[in-house]
């Protein structure tokens, strides 16, 4: 895929079950790639309010949605749920978010992006979002219901 208008410090994610890759553009919009045959970039329509800034995404298979964090620090976790017809010309994808009330607030991410330091995980029966803002940062875990 040539020059997809993706900032260098963001992370795309693949929804394997849907055969779709999604990423956030430099302007904060959503772009997707239909991976079912010859890859084709398209702009899905969205509902709700997105973060409006750079975002690293991860696919949450159990929740059937993309999960992400903006690079602004803070606790807000963003969700981008593809529609039942997520491909070009299909139904709108839905933005939503949550901001946990407790716990420590992660710092801003490293200026070069998260580079894979954002993961949806299940461990010892606990499901959530594991986030490491920088290579020498303390890890943060957002529990299930958040991720």
Give, region by region, the residue ranges found by the protein language model:
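Short loop/turn segments immediately following beta-strands, especially the blade-tip
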Residues: 33-40, 79-93, 143-147
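Beta-propeller domains
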Residues: 1-42, 51-53, 73
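Entry beta-strands of beta-propeller and related beta-repeat scaffolds
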Residues: 17-22, 62-68, 123-132
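Short glycine/acidic-enriched loop and turn motifs that connect beta-strands
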Residues: 28-29, 71-76, 125, 135-138
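Surface-exposed loop and turn segments in beta-propeller and other repeat-based domains
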Residues: 1-4, 45-49, 90-109
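Blade-level signature of beta-propeller repeat domains, shared across WD40, Kelch, NHL, RCC1
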Residues: 109-147
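Loop/turn-rich, solvent-exposed surfaces of beta-rich toroidal or solenoidal domains
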Residues: 49-88
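Repeated scaffold domains used in trafficking and secretory/extracellular systems
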Residues: 3-14, 49-59, 105-120
């Amino acid at each position: 895929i040539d020059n997809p208008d993706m900032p260098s410090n963001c992370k795309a994610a693949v929804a394997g079950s849907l055969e779709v890759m999604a990423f956030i553009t430099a302007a904060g919009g959503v772009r997707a790639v239909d991976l079912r045959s010859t890859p084709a970039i398209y702009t899905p329509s969205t509902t709700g309010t997105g973060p409006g800034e750079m975002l690293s995404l991860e696919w949450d298979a159990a929740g059937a949605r993309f999960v992400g964090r903006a690079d602004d620090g803070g606790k807000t976790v963003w969700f981008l749920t593809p529609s039942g017809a997520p491909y070009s010309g299909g139904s709108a994808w839905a933005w939503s978010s949550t901001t946990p009330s407790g716990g420590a607030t992660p710092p801003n991410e490293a200026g070069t992006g998260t580079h894979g330091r954002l993961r949806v995980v299940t461990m010892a029966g606990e499901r959530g979002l594991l986030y490491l803002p920088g290579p020498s940062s303390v890890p943060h875990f957002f529990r299930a219901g958040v991720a």
